[in-house]
């Protein structure tokens, strides 16, 4: 399975767990893990935020809070 995709539907469940790198993850069971790189106080993190795992200085940039 491509680590950049997530097979589950909106609100579904999947095996992302703590290693979620899905760009469009909408799984309720791994949303918090997807947003672990968000800064404190980012209200969007609990909604549709997904971390973009890159290397170096751009590592763990958050799609909703950069």
Curated annotation (Swiss-Prot):
Region entry Beta, spans: 1-30
Organism: Rattus norvegicus (Rat)
Higher taxonomy: Eukaryota, Metazoa, Chordata, Craniata, Vertebrata
Protein name per UniProt: Metallothionein-3
Family: Belongs to the metallothionein superfamily. Type 1 family.
KW Metal-binding (keyword) present: yes
UniProt record, GO biological process: activation of protein kinase B activity; cellular detoxification; cellular response to cadmium ion; cellular response to copper ion; cellular response to hypoxia; cellular response to oxidative stress; cellular response to reactive oxygen species; cellular response to zinc ion
Any GO molecular function: metal ion sequestering activity
Binding positions for a divalent metal cation 3 per the UniProt entry: 16, 20, 25, 30
Signal peptide limits: none
Family matches, as SUPFAM superfamilies: Metallothionein
